[in-house]
């Protein structure tokens, strides 16, 4: 960990020094859930978020049944549902040959047979607010981690900077939950295994009307693909383009983009006219990767910091939160008792690595067999035969909904 501090420099000796049991870096879904679950168990937790608020681009708004069940176990599903939200009960592929229902969440055996659509800033504020009920929880916004504190090969906390200058936060365990561009992953020198998804995404919103479908829809045709998710009064739209082609799309202009969208989904042509400025469109560079080891002494990575997910299936948030829940299950007792060791960190990786690698393998296959084919203008897109057969077999047709809704392994909150 060459980027970490091996000793405290003299200029920092006069800065603020604080102590916590667990320092969580990153106020995304994994970070806030882990902080809440540890705080509930009596562990002293400090959560550092680099930004001044929770409202940022590319934050998915999906909350899957697995997350809702987990929140229900700690009494938070009902109050969460009081926030303004929408529900997606089905996911369909709109192909040139007609619609194909990919996932019907209503068939799942759960109290929450849908994907909840809730602005992520509201979800994060809700969970952070619940964590703030515990006196052993502290949230620092606008706190940017600069360095790791390392002593004898063990991470003992971080040096961060906020509006008051640099400060030292010492901790028995530091958790990197700081997303796909993880600062802690970089500082810790973690090795990544990367893959190259064939696409990037243009991310924007257009008006939605009450008579519109309430599901998640994916449109295919003419070498183009558009995913639309119900956000209540708006559609959250993801226009899928070939990897590295965003400059050409922008150079062609907004008129060309609106025309391509209208050709793909003519019934929404009028809505696409609302796109009048490139500032309304954000580009998401799609990537997929995982670290070979999730931990080093005193340091653990979870969520996108440990495994960057492709947006296929929209499961990244679900997996990040399951990482957090499993980490809390394993770590709460040893942290509270002062008995944490490397074996506990290894156990977190053991429980969560195989579901992550499995879903990434599935995503890779879908990217190769479905999305790459859909983006080839020389081909007429057709749903692969094996996939159509799967959806027709009663015992198998619920599998896509289950994998999207719950992943390959359910995680429960340890009593």
PLM features: what roles do these ranges have?
Residues 2-9, 329-415:
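C-terminal helical "tail/cap" subdomain of flavin- and related membrane-associated enzymes
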Residues 13-30:
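Beta1/beta-strand and adjacent pyrophosphate-binding region of the FAD-binding site
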Residues 25, 39-59:
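Glycine-rich FAD pyrophosphate-binding loop
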Residues 64-130:
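Active-site-adjacent segment of FAD-dependent monooxygenases/related oxidoreductases
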Residues 141-155:
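A conserved short coil-to-beta-strand element within the FAD-binding core of flavoproteins
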Residues 154-286, 290-291, 295:
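Conserved FAD-binding catalytic core of PHBH/FMO-like flavoproteins
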Residues 225, 288-291, 306-318, 354:
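Glycine-rich phosphate/pyrophosphate-binding beta-alpha loops
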Residues 285-301, 357-358, 375:
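FAD-binding beta-loop-beta segment adjacent to the flavin cofactor pocket
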């Amino acid at each position: 960990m060459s980027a970490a501090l091996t000793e405290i420099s003299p200029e920092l000796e006069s800065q603020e020094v604080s102590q916590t049991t667990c320092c969580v870096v990153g106020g995304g879904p994994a970070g806030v859930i882990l902080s809440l679950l540890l705080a509930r168990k009596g562990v002293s937790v400090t959560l550092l978020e680099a930004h001044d608020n929770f409202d940022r681009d590319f934050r998915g708004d999906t909350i899957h049944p697995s997350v809702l069940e987990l929140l229900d176990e700690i009494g938070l599903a009902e109050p969460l549902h009081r926030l303004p939200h929408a529900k997606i009960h089905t996911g369909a592929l709109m192909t040139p040959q007609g619609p194909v229902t990919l996932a019907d969440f209503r068939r799942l055996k759960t109290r929450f047979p849908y994907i909840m659509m809730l602005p992520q800033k509201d979800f994060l504020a809700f969970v952070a607010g619940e964590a703030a009920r515990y006196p052993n929880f502290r949230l620092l916004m606008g706190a940017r981690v600069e360095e790791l504190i390392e002593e004898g090969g063990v991470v003992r906390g971080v040096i961060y900077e906020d509006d008051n200058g640099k400060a030292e936060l010492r901790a028995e365990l530091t958790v990197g939950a700081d997303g796909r561009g993880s600062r802690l992953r970089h500082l810790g020198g973690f090795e990544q295994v990367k893959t190259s998804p064939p696409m990037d995404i243009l991310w924007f919103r257009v008006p939605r009307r009450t008579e519109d479908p309430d599901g998640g829809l994916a449109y295919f045709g003419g070498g183009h693909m558009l995913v639309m998710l119900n956000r209540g009064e708006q559609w959250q739209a993801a226009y899928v383009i070939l990897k590295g082609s965003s400059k050409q799309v922008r150079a062609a202009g907004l008129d060309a983009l609106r025309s391509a969208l209208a050709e793909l989904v003519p019934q929404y042509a009028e809505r696409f006219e609302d796109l009048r400025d490139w500032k309304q469109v954000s580009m998401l560079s799609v990537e997929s990767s995982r670290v070979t080891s999730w931990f080093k002494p005193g340091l653990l990575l979870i969520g996108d910091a440990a495994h960057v997910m492709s947006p296929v299936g929209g499961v990244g948030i679900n997996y990040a939160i399951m990482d957090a829940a499993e980490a809390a299950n394993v770590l709460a007792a040893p942290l509270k008792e002062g008995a944490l060791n490397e074996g506990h960190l290894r156990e977190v990786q053991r429980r969560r690595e195989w579901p992550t690698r499995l879903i990434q393998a599935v995503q890779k296959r879908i990217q190769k067999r479905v999305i790459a084919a859909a983006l080839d203008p020389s081909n007429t897109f057709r749903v692969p035969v094996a996939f159509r057969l799967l959806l027709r077999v009663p015992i198998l047709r619920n599998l896509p909904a289950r994998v999207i809704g719950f992943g390959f392994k359910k995680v429960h909150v340890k009593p």
